[in-house]
Amino acid sequence: MSDNYVALLGTKGGPAIRPGSSMPTSNLVVMSGQHILLDCGLGVTKGIVDQGMALKELSLIFISHMHSDHYLELGPLLHTAWTAGLKTKVTVYGPKGLDAYWDGFLASMKADIDLRIEDEGRPDLRNLLDIHVIDADKVYEQSGLTVSALRTEHPPLIDCFAFSFKTAAKHVVFSGDTAPIKALEDFARGADLLIHEAMLESALPALMTRIGNGSDKLMTHWLRSHTFAHDAAKTATQAGVKRLALSHLIPSDDPTYGPKDWQDACADHWSGELIVGGDGIKIEL
């Protein structure tokens, strides 16, 4: 295994899980000697340890936007890491609203946190997180790694970001949640790997039926705020990236659709290596 890789911890688009589905969005980026989390959907904690990483080694997290499938387990992850030995600060970069989420989580767990400090002698969890609100442009730079953000088109949210992770030798881009936008082509120009969200157009009506408690507004959201697989393929081609991986898959739990359907959806617009995401997949850089 290379010293630089991406692990797709959770590859499902949307917050719900059903029998046979993958888990919501989370990713582990290992570059320039750093282990970085991007998004913390449900299941991220187990996803990390399944990759062989100790939770107490957490240090840097990026959150793309304030939809629950991207940050729901941030609080439980940090609390579990704390009980697993975390004693150094974790830095989180994300949109406005994360601080309110964290304050609410701490308030909900106050009795347990106070008890473990008193009864077990642990450091105060409330002092172990630094949150930085991000905007587009360069977000982070350290040890030869530069992380940049691009605001995407994901209405009704305004603060939703794609991320670029770049060293002198490697370049990885995550689309974040977005409708197709020209700016992402420039942002991902020449990247070694583009990880792009994707939907299968023909599968959406059946998914609406399975969900059962959404109105036509949900379909409207998908169509205006996300990207079909064939459009992700077009973006990858226009950006001149070396490899394309599909993640945040909608749907991820319909047994009538498999990897070939995703490959067929991209075939007319992408001729390079295509990776159809699955939970736990490691992609070497």
Residue spans for each PLM region:
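Cap/insert and terminal regions of metallo-dependent hydrolase folds
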Residues: 162, 171-173, 179-278
